[in-house]
A protein has these predicted regions:
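Alpha/beta catalytic cores of group-transfer enzymes, especially the acyltransferase/condensing modules
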Residues: 122, 132, 139
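A glycine-rich beta-to-alpha transition motif near the start of alpha/beta enzyme domains, typified by
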Residues: 1-121, 167-187
Length: 187
């Protein structure tokens, strides 16, 4: 692999390899992303985020050409619409690398649509996540979620905010406290 200038960033215990590629010259592939995210052979991260102007990506076609686009890849090499923690890290990266001012907000492009990020000071950022999309809300649920600490899988409703989530209703806070969330739930 050739030399690659990168920044490592993290937000709420998710870490990312960030690449500044304003002119869209960097070739990313699933294999390269998996290598970069590999914690033994590569840099190690939950994902790769490339900062690129929208005009240089097919996915950026619906945005103003000068819009910064968050080209987000999961650690398995798959493309993702966006990541809530990643978009805040991306904003800090744009302040540092591109000199962007976010105190009045900056609209960025993602595969999940536009997101507006505003710097709050002290390294904190607010993100307008856009509209959510529900799964089969009329049915009340559309998935089953199994998690350590529950004796049986529970019904869940899919909620998409640019990346998928599943919401499970629990009877009490004690029930929540009894879950082992160090292991990903099975959907």
């Amino acid at each position: 692999m050739n030399r690659l200038r990168f920044t490592k960033g993290h937000g709420t215990e998710n870490d990312f390899v960030l690449l500044f590629d304003e002119h869209g010259e960097l070739e990313l592939s699933p294999e390269r992303v998996r290598y970069l995210c590999d914690r033994r052979a590569g840099i190690g991260a939950d994902g790769v985020i490339r900062a690129v102007r929208a005009r240089h990506l097919e996915a950026g076609a619906g945005f103003s050409p000068e819009t910064w686009f968050m080209d987000y890849w999961n650690s398995d090499g798959s493309l993702s619409e966006m990541c809530g923690n990643g978009v805040r890290v991306f904003a800090a990266f744009l302040e540092h690398e591109a000199g962007e001012r976010l105190d009045r907000g900056l609209t960025i492009g993602t595969r999940g649509g536009e997101r507006t990020v505003t710097a709050l000071g002290d390294g904190r950022y607010a993100v307008g996540m856009g509209r959510y999309r529900l799964g089969d809300a009329d049915a009340g649920f559309d998935a089953q979620v199994a998690v350590r600490g529950l004796s049986t899988a529970r019904p869940a409703l899919s909620v998409d905010v640019g990346n998928p989530h599943h919401v499970v209703a629990l009877a009490t806070e004690d029930e929540l406290a009894g879950l082992d969330l160090t292991v990903a739930p099975h959907v």
